[in-house]
Amino acid sequence: MVRAKRKLDHIEYALSTGQSRTHGFHDIEFVHQSLPNSSYETITCETKIGELSLSSPIFINAMTGGGGEKTLHINEQLAYVAKHHNLAMAVGSQMAALKDESEAASYKIIRKVNPNGIFFANLGSEATVEQAERAVDMVGANALQIHLNVIQELTMPEGDRDFTGVLQRIEKIVLNSKVPVIVKEVGFGMSKETMQQLASVGVTAIDIGGQGGTNFAAVENERRQRMLSYFNNWGIQTATSIIEATSTNNNLSFIASGGIQTALDVAKAIALGANTTAFAGYFLRILMEDGIEKLVDEIDLLHTDLKFIMTALGAKTIEELQSVPLVIKGETYHWLTQRGIDTTHYSRR
């Protein structure tokens, strides 16, 4: 019951705190192309996460489940939207359903709505191999997300305080999983060192979950009597974290999330090196405040605008968009310089 109440609290406070939009994309500027040699009608947006083919570089990221009828209804609506647009979708952490079978329906609903969709299961880094297998089977998942949320847990009044052995648990899950494993942050970004460690244990993809979207430190602080306000501005911005990711020069796929709301955000994230982008809080707000049809329309506009931007840049495919020239400025440039990451190749390609 406590876990279910927390799920509902997270929805309420995530909507009330909003998104910070401190993602750093304002420091990224495309180099204008006066002769793009492109046509809107021939632009294609297919992409891949590992060997998993996606029809769009936009997917619906993990939000909820395990909070009774309300979370069931949210996942039902999100699954409908995913089916309508042929988008991949992740569910929120399934630990609630593993501990209380009555909550499983709030996750299983997605397969009832969209039997042939691409879905990601989701568990925290405390999960065992057996729990990971059950979570995947619960929703017939095509991949498994393992989320890292140290700052959220520390800020959460009833959260975890012991984070030893996490990498080893992830490695065991990777070795035993029948589906690709994606490791994701929840709004605090990832450093290149963390991503190199994750690559070393064989994960397929990393969702950098950068600072700039829903602030789960702020969400949990709303639930505390004594606020840990020093965590409210903690983390690595989304744009910076994507560049840290690509600087590792490994074969992982990268997912950009954290405050992404516009087609320009999507285009910049992909141009920095992401394979796809994920929306959560922004889509949830539209769904809860304006309804399902408004969300369907918004995703239509996102795809239209992304194709306009790709046409302007002369990028006919997502792969070509990953190679267009851009300039990195401001705080993002200074951070990367201090971290020893060369940015000149972005502007000269």
Curated annotation (Swiss-Prot):
FMN binds at residues 62-64, 93, 122, 184, 214, 258-259, 280-281. It is found in: Cytoplasm. Its main location: cytoplasm. It comes from the Bacteria. GO terms for biological process: isoprenoid biosynthetic process. GO terms for cellular component: cytoplasm. Its cofactor is FMN; NADPH; Mg(2+). Transmembrane segments: none annotated. Substrate binds at residues 6-7, 152. Keywords: Cytoplasm, Flavoprotein, FMN, Isomerase, Isoprene biosynthesis, Magnesium, Metal-binding, NADP. Its EC number is 5.3.3.2. Mg(2+) binds at residue 153. It catalyses: isopentenyl diphosphate = dimethylallyl diphosphate. GO terms for molecular function: FMN binding; isopentenyl-diphosphate delta-isomerase activity; magnesium ion binding; NADPH binding; oxidoreductase activity. Gene3D superfamilies: Aldolase class I. Belongs to the IPP isomerase type 2 family. Homooctamer. Dimer of tetramers. Involved in the biosynthesis of isoprenoids. Catalyzes the 1,3-allylic rearrangement of the homoallylic substrate isopentenyl (IPP) to its allylic isomer, dimethylallyl diphosphate (DMAPP). This is Isopentenyl-diphosphate delta-isomerase. The lineage of its organism: Bacteria, Bacillati, Bacillota, Bacilli, Bacillales. The gene is fni.
